Structures are given as structure tokens and as C-alpha cells.
């Protein structure tokens, strides 16, 4: 990061929240004749570079799609690797993130997730809970539809118990039932790899997000690619449904 200078973008034109789909790790490795797992290893370093780039820009919130609820459909070998890998990444990187003033938050479901992964996620949250330079939401065992379903179930439970009236639920109160109620809406939805879809990521939060898709696979993604995406975001006219 030291040799890169972030673009000079006024704070009011910066995204407050970037959602990052870290896509293409497996394809990157396959194209190079490596095991798919090597692509994920490379992705760890790239994510840290993205965090540094966000800090340099002054972007306060980054959500990283680390493991989706659909990823359980992958081979047993790859799922086992990804569970251990996510656990070890948190263990390796939490102190460094803490030193940079990054607050780590976990967004996702507990069921099926390895207990060792949960322990590391909770340890990272506890260590970094008072940091204010930036928030990194690690989305592990996360799915946008699952999050909305879980919220709907909790609303139904409270309504059945007489704790909640239907008219109390609206666009302002519904997020209180999501995995991370304090998460701001996504401003910039960024996906490398050439794929142009949301893949069930932060569906509620991304209602008015600006989508930027880049052709580069995630292991080849650089801070400059992030800067380019943020510059494109800053040039757009966000109307939020108005004329």
C-alpha cells in the first residue's frame, strides 16, 4: 500500500459501506494448474490489501463474503478446507487488524458452522469491539435469503407472544431483526471475476447499492482495482427512485 496513493475523493462522494464478493479464487487456481485451495490462500492476502485500501480511502465499512450458506454444496474436501481456512485466517490476522483499529463483526448463521470457527469469530469480535477506524464484517455461513427468513421468524415469534404489533414493522424497524442491525445500507456492491450477479449477498442492505463488476479474478485483485471502483461509484448519480 505504501507505493499507492488513493484518489482524492471528497468524503461526501465516498461509499460508506462496500460489499465485496470475493469471487474467482478456485478458478484462478485451476487456470494455473493448482489446487482450488491455493486460490483461497491467495485471497487472504488480497483481502488484507483491500482492508488497507479502505483505510487509506476513509471507507468506514467493508463486508466480505467469506462463506455462503450455499457453499455447503461444494465437495466435502473443499468445505472442510474452507472451515479450517476461515478459522486460521481469523487467528492469524486478528491482532494485525486490531492494531490498525479495525473492528471485526461476524454476520451469519451459527448452525452447521464449526465450533472452532465460531470461537475465532467471537474472539476477534471481542478483541476489536472498541475499534473505530473501520468495521470489517466477515460474512461466514451467510445468505441474504436466510437472513431475511430468520428475521421474519423472529418477528412472527414476537407477534405470537404479544410482544409486537404488525403495524410496528416497517422499513426502519425491520433491520432491527437482521443479523447486524447497525450495518449501514450498502453503497457500493463490488464483484470481481466477471460474474454479474449478487449471489444472495446482503439482499436487504443492497436495495439501492451501485453495482460495479470487474473482470479480474479475486486473487489478482489489487488496491488500484478498488480505487477504480470507488472512482466509478463517485461519478454516478444516485437517485434512490426519484426522477
Curated annotation (Swiss-Prot):
Write one Gene Ontology MF term: manganese ion binding
Which key words tag this protein in UniProt?
Magnesium, Metal-binding, Transferase
Question: Looking at its record, which EC class is this enzyme?
Answer: transferase
Question: Signal sequence: where?
Answer: none
Query: What's a GO cellular component annotated to this UniProt protein?
Result: plasma membrane
Q: Which Gene3D superfamilies match?
A: Decaprenyl diphosphate synthase-like (3.40.1180.10)
Question: Which of this chain's residues are annotated to bind substrate?
Answer: 24-28, 36, 40, 68-70, 72, 74, 191, 197-199
Query: A Pfam family matched by this chain, by name?
Result: Prenyltransf
- Report the cofactors: Mg(2+)
Question: Where, by residue number, does Mg(2+) bind?
Answer: 23, 210
**Which free-text remark accompanies the cofactor?**
Binds 2 magnesium ions per subunit.
Give GO BP annotations, semicolon-separated: polyprenol biosynthetic process
E.C. code? 2.5.1.-
Catalytic positions? 23, 71
Q: Subunit notes for this chain?
A: Homodimer.
Please state which protein family the record places this protein in: Belongs to the UPP synthase family.
Q: What does this protein do?
A: Catalyzes the condensation of isopentenyl diphosphate (IPP) with allylic pyrophosphates generating different type of terpenoids.
Stated name of the protein: Isoprenyl transferase 2
Give the encoding gene's name: uppS2
